[in-house]
Amino acid sequence: MSELLSFALFLASVLIYAWKAGRNTWWFAATLTVLGLFVVLNITLFASDYFTGDGINDAVLYTLTNSLTGAGVSKYILPGIGIVLGLTAVFGALGWILRRRRRHPHHFGYSLLALLLALGSVDASPAFRQITELVKSQSRDGDPDFAAYYKEPSRTIPDPKLNLVYIYGESLERTYFDNEAFPDLTPELGALKNEGLDFSHTQQLPGTNYTIAGMVASQCGIPLFAPFEGNASASVSSFFPQNICLGDILKNSGYQNYFVQGANLRFAGKDVFLKSHGFDHLYGSEELKSVVADPHYRNDWGFYDDTVLDEAWKKFEELSRSGQRFSLFTLTVDTHHPDGFISRTCNRKKYDFDGKPNQSFSAVSCSQENIATFINKIKASPWFKDTVIVVSSDHLAMNNTAWKYLNKQDRNNLFFVIRGDKPQQETLAVKRNTMDNGATVLDILGGDNYLGLGRSSLSGQSMSEIFLNIKEKTLAWKPDIIRLWKFPKEMKEFTIDQQKNMIAFSGSHFRLPLLLRVSDKRVEPLPESEYSAPLRFQLADFAPRDNFVWVDRCYKMAQLWAPELALSTDWCVSQGQLGGQQIVQHVDKAIWKGKTAFKDTVIDMARYKGNVDTLKIVDNDIRYKADSFIFNVAGAPEEVKQFSGISRPESWGRWSNAQLGDEVKIEYKHPLPKKFDLVITAKAYGNNASRPIPVRVGNEEQTLVLGNEVTTTTLHFDNPTDADTLVIVPPEPVSTNEGNILGHSPRKLGIGMVEIKVVEREG
């Protein structure tokens, strides 16, 4: 209803101003601004729904002030371009309509009415309401009844008798199991669901709507609200350190806790969370690559579900035979948005919907088959009688190719339990949410029936039943939940440990690199993650007087305040204010101690603008003073005009990447010398090793041969045509995820470049 009202007010404002208000520059500008805000808000809501499937939530609010980088972002480039072009067209059309009767005399009353209607359209829009509620949630002091509902359980289970297998299905919400809506999509896992305790109304609440948040909610009974963006949790050294979570209770009760997934454990800090709460045995892509049958059989995120679940089965067998009490948690990935992935061993590789193949539905059908195969192995084993199997989605599906069909249904998360000791077949329609999962499992295992804000759905009353406005209530508790981190409120001294790549202050520890906004009563950490902008872009959003401490590689801040460190990959500390004074200190000891020193100086807005503009220079446009191209730092020497076909800097150098260009091209500002030596320090990747690699300057071509280890080769060139471009052509670029950012499409690697130097020869 509010959507229709806001649109009606918007339309009325446009028509009244266009036909009745007449000509006045001030009223035109004011009305266009407010109407433009309405358009921006609604496009933001549309775009947010496209990315998250959940409107404007915490993750979107974070992204609006940073950037959307990371997993699968290339799939969204075209929609993003479409939104920008559409926004430009709408603004142009809106301005043209409002000025249709600009030759008519100005009418104050109609101008005022049009502006008030425009303001009303903004106020009534769902986008404005969602953003307002999110902003309020950032500044509230909390809710006094939080302590009454947040309950810590006993730290042990009195007499544990059952092992636990807990399967998180990536985005595998219960909606997929509606056979009337999606016929024969999930027959294998659906049949198993119907044999157990099936909880049919599991809500998704704020702070539980992405993987690490869903894991925290299900194991600790609280949403993931933090003093930083949740997916940046990889930078912290401990995760809700004061909370008692399911893993802690299991460990205290004699369980050995295992976690197996196909993706990198560091992503979003899953390793930190699990290690902080009772898990001593973790297996991700790095740990599995030496034990899986085919280490090259991977998707954009890591190992396919069939590989991961095979390893989980082997671990289940091993642990069951040992007689040791254990829990085994596993997380699938093949159903990850936007398209999903199809394991090669499943029979269900294709699912048609609306008369055509649908990749997301196909991935769901394949993944559920793999999960069902794993469960059936456990059920057929002699150890099933001592086992509880839990299957749940980590969160509702985000925007994928099935999302518009899911939204036509009543959407709920998946949560069902299969008991080997006491078979129970029942569908329970009680209202509940993801935070109740851990408490329900704890209850089944013989522990308490509460865990944080979670309650057992077998013997307790969920917050979703107690509060009709549970989503608003959850946001009201956000400050209380953030306080559970026990995060410091001041920063006076700090210590950097170069060996561990950590910074410590006021009892807290963070992984480097790190940016901190420091005020009198608050220290706000801004870590760098797959989903966040680089720290220098985040710093560019600071106000002129905001105090900052920035710990990063020296070359990243050198272009601003320390040009002598432009080629240094050591750690440096910069602090100050963007509109005031800044200092840069080189971290030159293994254990380096520093102090914050913020001076209350006069703010120079010209200096501020210059700093912001420099911080926002993209990597490939950065230039430094050097007589060679150093590839382990961002940018290029001042003599280089532009370059292409080269991937991002890594600690050793950079790979060529045929996804960015079939050839490595380095164009210099001036012609290369008539005679010169080209000194190349590099290595080859895969099948490019020991093969001739063409290197061209103008019409002359030399051949470079590299091995898998870094070597230095000198090639002699004559350049009679005054060519200014160097071209290197890797013969067989290899598609691989090695060293890739998690979730990005594979790179096509050819040669790895450490340094290229042009040395003029006499004569």
UniProtKB/Swiss-Prot annotation:
GO terms assigned for molecular function: phosphatidylglycerol-membrane-oligosaccharide glycerophosphotransferase activity
Gene Ontology cellular-component annotations: plasma membrane
Gene Ontology process terms (BP): glucan biosynthetic process
Predominant place of localization: membrane
Top-rank lineage group of the source organism: Bacteria
Subcellular location, record wording: Cell inner membrane
Annotated S-S bridges: none
Entry's transmembrane regions: 1-21, 26-46, 77-97, 108-128
Reactions it catalyzes: a phosphatidylglycerol + a membrane-derived-oligosaccharide D-glucose = a 1,2-diacyl-sn-glycerol + a membrane-derived-oligosaccharide 6-(glycerophospho)-D-glucose
InterPro entries reported for this sequence: Alkaline_phosphatase_core_sf (IPR017850), DUF7024 (IPR054288), OpgB (IPR020881), OpgB/LTA_synthase_biosynth (IPR050448), Sulfatase_N (IPR000917)
EC number: 2.7.8.20
Pathway: Glycan metabolism; osmoregulated periplasmic glucan (OPG) biosynthesis
Keywords attached to this entry: Cell inner membrane, Cell membrane, Membrane, Transferase, Transmembrane, Transmembrane helix
Membrane topology designation: Multi-pass membrane protein
Signal sequence bounds: none
UniProt xrefs under PANTHER family: LIPOTEICHOIC ACID SYNTHASE, PHOSPHOGLYCEROL TRANSFERASE I
Family that this chain belongs to: Belongs to the OpgB family.
NCBIfam families, per database record: PRK03776.1
Name this protein carries in UniProt: Phosphoglycerol transferase I
Organism of derivation: Escherichia coli O127:H6 (strain E2348/69 / EPEC)
Source organism phylogeny: Bacteria, Pseudomonadati, Pseudomonadota, Gammaproteobacteria, Enterobacterales
